[in-house]
C-alpha cells in the first residue's frame, strides 16, 4: 500500500475496478475464500471472433475476470481462465459455492445455444485449473415439462442436498445430491410478499444461512439491490421470507414510470473464515462518466441484529488503510443569527461552518453525536466545500426519518437507535466516489465529480421558527454538540490495478 494517490483522475485509490478501460456489465461473481486467499470474479464483455450464438452481441462475448486478495482490499489480477476459448460459450451471472468435497465451483448462465445454466468446478485451490463445464438439466417441472434454468442461477446447500434456481418473477427450484442428476422441487418461496411490487423479477441472487436465518440477496432489474430474510422450511423445501429491504435508492432525475435504479446492483457475497458475511455490488448507473468503468462498492459486512433488522458496516479491514489521524472533541456549533448569509427569511436560519481541511482525495471521516442532541434537528455536513463551492451535501432529516447524500435519499429513523447508542456516521471518500454508513443501519453511495474544487469539511445546522424582531433566540435548536470527529487519510490500495492496467494479464482470448 502507498500513501500516494493514483495520478489518473478516474482511477480510484481503494475501490475495486476494472483496469482495462470501458467495460460493461461488471457483475461480481464466483466469490470464495480458499486457503488464506479471497477470490472474486466479475463479468467482462470483450471482443470475440470465435463461433457466434443466437441473441449474443455480434463479435463480442463474456468472460469472468479473476482477482485475488489476502484482505479484500489489495487485489491482484490473475490470468483469465473462465472464458469462451475454454468453456465453449460466453459466461454470464451466477454464484460461487464450495462442493461437499471442499472444491470451489460455480453455477452460471452460459451464453450458449441453447441458453442454459452450467456448473464448473476447480481442480486446484489457486483456481488456476478448471474442469470443463457441463449443463444443469433438471427432470420434471411445474407444467409437466422439464424445467429450465436459464438466467442468473444460484445454488445453496442444505445438509447433503444442493438446491438451484434461476432468475424469474416466479422462481422455480430443483435439487441434486451429486450436482449431476437434478429433479424439480417447486417454487423457491411464497409469492405476493409485502413490500414488493407485482412484476419485480428476482435476479443476480445469492442465498445463504445467515445468523440462524436465511438471507436471499438479489436484485430486481428496475429497483436494484434488495434482500429477503427468513427461514428455510425443510419439510416443504421452501424459503419462507419474513422481511424484505432495499439497498438501492432512487435519484430525483430517474423516471417514476420506467424506474431503473441500478446504482447498487448485481450483488455477490463471501463468508470469511471468522464467520462474517461480506458483499459487493456493481455500481451500474452511478454516473455517466463512471458507468463503463466496472467499479465495485466497498466490501460491506452484513449481520443480523437481535431485533431482526439487517446491519450493514464497512469491511473491518478498511481500518488498515488509516493513517495521520486528526481528532476533534466536544465541538459546539452555533448558528450565527447575525450573519446575513445564514438568514433565509425572518423566521428561518441555516448555518454552515468550516470544521477542517480534508486530507486529500482519499479519506475516512467518523462523526459521533449523542442521540439526544440530534433528536428533532435537521443537520449535516458538506465535503469538498469552500467559500465558493457548496461541495457534496449529507443531510440528516430527523423530522422525516430520512438521510440524504447529494441526490440520493434513503430511510433512516433516529428513533430506531437505542437511547444509549450514539449517532455514528462514517464517510469514505475515494476521489469522486463517496460512501456513507450510519450506525450500521443504512448506507448510501454517490459520485461527486467536482471533488477537487473544494477541500473543506463544513458543518450544517438548520434552525427555524425564530423571531428576530423580538430578539428571541431558541438556543436549543440553534446549537449542535458533536462528541467527536476523527479524520484519517487512507492509503492507496490499488497498486495491483496499475500493474494490471499495464500488463493486461487478465485479457481474454478473442477466438
Residue ranges and their predicted role:
Residues 2, 223, 233-254, 258-262, ...:
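Beta-rich accessory regions
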Residues 2-20, 29, 35-80:
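Beta-propeller domains
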Residues 6-18, 70-84, 125-144, 173-197, ...:
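Blade-edge beta-strand/turn elements of extracellular beta-propeller
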Residues 12, 27, 62, 92, ...:
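Residues that flank catalytic or metal-binding motifs in active/ligand-binding sites
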Residues 24, 89, 146-148, 200, ...:
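Conserved loop/turn at the beginning of each blade in beta-propeller domains
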Residues 27-55, 77-82, 92-121, 135-174, ...:
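Hydrophobic core segments of beta-strands in well-ordered, beta-rich domains
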Residues 63-71, 117-125, 170-178, 227-235, ...:
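Beta-propeller blade signature
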Residues 168-170, 179, 222-224, 431:
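Surface-exposed loop/turn positions within WD40 beta-propeller blades
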